[in-house]
A protein has these predicted regions:
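A short alpha->beta transition loop at the rim of the catalytic pocket in nucleotide-sugar-dependent
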Residues: 121, 143-145, 150
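A short, well-ordered alpha-helix in the C-terminal region of glycosyltransferases
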Residues: 214, 221, 228-243
Length: 263
């Protein structure tokens, strides 16, 4: 008959990760991303989405900024400053680095992370695939809506009514397909036009490539509709507290499951 299984997700301390007031660069609209600068996070696609967003809306660095919390010279990824300056021409829009060399431990403490999340208006992740998405949930706990690639676990966190949701078919829309940008009550699910095979050294999964123009439209929607931003922020926080708080949600699930274990 097979094995019975129980899924219990990661959690977050929502009494620690919470909305606070922090200064923002020129009070600009800040698109942020907390991730490792590595292959599957697709950071260049986020940079191009941001470029499209500011160009189509004629925004200056006083109007909008891009905050990339990651090691900007990680050997697993890209040279962020080089890409911003020489490929996309958005170096003036970048918030200065919020951490140094990851391998040397040059990163902020937990309190610093709360400050970083709260500098953002929205959290964006063009990921090619996730096992869960801890920064996504931490951002929600801080009251930040997510604009995230609609692949693997993203729907569960940003789109579903609850984590224990039905499986969702994962199919690309194709290069000529409908953009199908999905607005939820706490963020946007960005469609992916195509998939690529990753290398065997990275376990060879298929990685999604998010639609850069669709993501730019999501940024624009939040920029122009601050009432929606405010409502989604409130909903993101409420969802994180209800479903991902360690004490109120995750720990009770573990306690209930442990009672069923036969030794």
């Amino acid at each position: 008959d097979g094995y019975e299984s129980t899924v219990i997700s990661h959690g977050v301390d929502t009494n620690f990760f919470k909305p606070i007031d922090v200064p923002k660069p020129n009070d600009a609209f800040v698109v942020g991303c907390v991730a490792r600068n590595q292959h599957r996070k697709n950071i260049p696609r986020l940079m191009r989405s941001f470029k499209i967003f500011v160009e189509e809306n004629n925004l200056t660095p006083d109007d909008a900024r891009l905050l990339l919390h990651m090691d900007w010279v990680d050997h697993m990824g890209w040279n962020i400053e080089h890409m911003a300056k020489n490929v996309y021409g958005i170096e003036e829009y970048l918030v200065p680095p919020t951490m140094g060399n990851m391998e040397k431990g040059e990163h902020p403490d937990d309190n610093g992370m709360v400050d970083i999340y709260n500098m953002m208006d929205i959290h964006a992740l063009p990921t090619g695939g996730e096992g869960f998405g801890i920064p996504t949930v931490e951002a929600m706990a801080c009251g930040k809506p997510n604009v995230i690639c609609d692949y693997t676990t993203s729907y569960e966190i940003v789109g579903a009514d609850k984590p224990e949701c039905p499986e969702k078919m994962l199919l690309p829309h194709g290069l000529e397909g409908d953009d199908n940008l999905i607005e939820t009550n706490r963020g946007f699910l960005v469609p992916y036009k195509d998939l690529m095979w990753d290398t065997p050294i990275r376990a060879a999964p298929m990685r999604a490539l998010w639609d850069e123009h669709a993501a730019a439209k999501a940024f624009e929607h939040y920029y122009k509709n601050r009432d929606v931003l405010k409502e989604h922020s409130k909903n993101a926080r409420a969802y994180a507290v209800k479903h991902y708080d360690w004490n109120n949600s995750i720990a009770p699930k573990w306690k209930n499951w442990l009672k069923t274990v036969k030794i």
